[in-house]
Amino acid sequence: MAVVLRLSRAGTHKAPFYHVVATDSRNARDGKYIEDVGIYDPTQQPERIELKAERIEHWLKVGATPSQTVAMILKRAKKTAQPAEKKA
């Protein structure tokens, strides 16, 4: 079973938001999933990104591969989570 971290679409017509889920790669986009590991809402300003970092880390250690979009979201979330460096 190849586990993938990818987006599952939810919301209404023209107002989508996405669940970040761990699922078998053969399952449909909005089909059943193993675990819900976060939320991504691109319609809000600024974008709403809520991730369960420890669960995502677990799935990556076990061998799950993130989709291109989820990899981009993870990278963006890491940038915003790091504190800004102070200049002396």
UniProtKB/Swiss-Prot annotation:
The keyword Ribosomal protein applies. Keywords: Ribonucleoprotein, Ribosomal protein. One of its GO terms (biological process) is translation. Coiled coil: none annotated. Signal peptide: none annotated. InterPro entries: Ribosomal_bS16 (IPR000307), Ribosomal_bS16_dom_sf (IPR023803). It holds the Pfam family Ribosomal_S16. One of its GO terms (molecular function) is structural constituent of ribosome. GO terms for cellular component: cytoplasm; small ribosomal subunit. Belongs to the bacterial ribosomal protein bS16 family. This is Small ribosomal subunit protein bS16. It comes from Anaeromyxobacter sp. (strain Fw109-5).
